[in-house]
Amino acid sequence: MEHGLPDPLGAGRVLVTGAGGQLGAALREVFLEADARTRADLDVTEPIELGYRPSLVLHAAAWTDVDGAESNEEAALEANVRGTRYVAALGAPLVYFSSDYVFDGAKREPYVESDDPAPLSAYGRTKLLGEREIREGWIVRSSWLFGWTGHNFVRTMLRLGAERDEVRVVADQRGSPTYVGHLAVATRELLSRPHGVWHLAADGDCTWADLAAAVFEEAGLDCRVTPISTEELGRPAPRPAYSVLRSEREGAPRLPHWRDGLRECLARLGA
C-alpha cells in the first residue's frame, strides 16, 4: 500500500461518507466538489449502490461512542469494520479515519506510525480492524477530535461552563486535541503523499482538564476546573493514559497547535 495516486481529484467524483458528523461537515467545506452523504442517505453497513464509481472516498462514517462500544461491540464492528469493507468494495482509493485509541498508552513519548497498535477498548479494536480492511489508500489516525457541530468535548464544556461554577475533569489522560477544520485541510494535502498509515493530529498536547480550562479561558467563562482521575470518573471503556500522535514520515502534513484550533472553533461557535 506504499504508493500514491497521480491525482485522485483529477477525474471522477469524490464521495464523503458520514457527512453529517463533525469530521464529515469539515470535509464538506474543504472538498466542495464532493458527493457528501449522511447516514440518512447512505448506510455503509449495507452493500452500497451509487450508480457511479468514485475516484476517491473520504470515509468519515463510523461508530464513535467509545463507552457504548463496550456493551455493544457487535454494532461497533458492523459500522467500523463491515461498513469499511463495503466502502472499500467500491474499488476507489480510500481515506479511512482511525484513532489514537488503537494504542494502549504505555509510552510517554508520541506514538508514530511504526509503533505497534494494542487497543484497550472495544472501540479501539474495531477501529484497528477497520484499518485492516484498507487495500488502497490512506489510513489517517488522529486524536481527540472537536468541531463546531455534533457531540464533542469542547461543545460540552461550553455548555457546562455557562451552567456551573465548577466542573470535574480527568487530568491523567494526555492527547492532542485536533480541530476537524485543520484535519480536513491536512487530509486534502495528504492526497499528494504515498498511501499507507499517517498520523495527523494537532501540534502540542494536553490533558482533558487542560483543555477544559483553555475552553473557559478563551470563552471568558468563570468556571473552575477540578482535576480528577480516570478511575474517579468511572467510565465503562478503558482509555490510554497517553495517546499523543506524531508523524515520523517524510512530508507529513503539519497541523496547527491545538490551542489555535480551539480558538478557530470557538470563533465559529460565536463563543
What residues fall within each predicted segment?
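Conserved C-terminal active-site "lid" loop/helix of NAD(P)H-dependent oxidoreductases
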Residues: 48, 207-213, 228-271
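NAD(P)H-binding glycine-rich loop region in Rossmannoid oxidoreductase-like domains
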Residues: 48-79
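N-terminal Rossmann NAD(P)H-binding glycine-rich loop of SDR-like oxidoreductase domains
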Residues: 4-32
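SDR active-site strand-loop-helix element
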Residues: 17, 37, 60-61, 94-100, ...
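Mid/C-terminal beta-alpha module of Rossmann-like enzyme folds, strongest
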Residues: 186, 192-236
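NAD(P)-dependent short-chain dehydrogenase/reductase
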Residues: 132-175, 181-182
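Adenosine-cofactor binding site in Rossmann-like domains, unifying the SAM/SAH pocket
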Residues: 32-49
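Catalytic helix-loop patch of NAD(P)-dependent Rossmann-fold dehydrogenases
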Residues: 71, 78-83, 102-140, 144-147
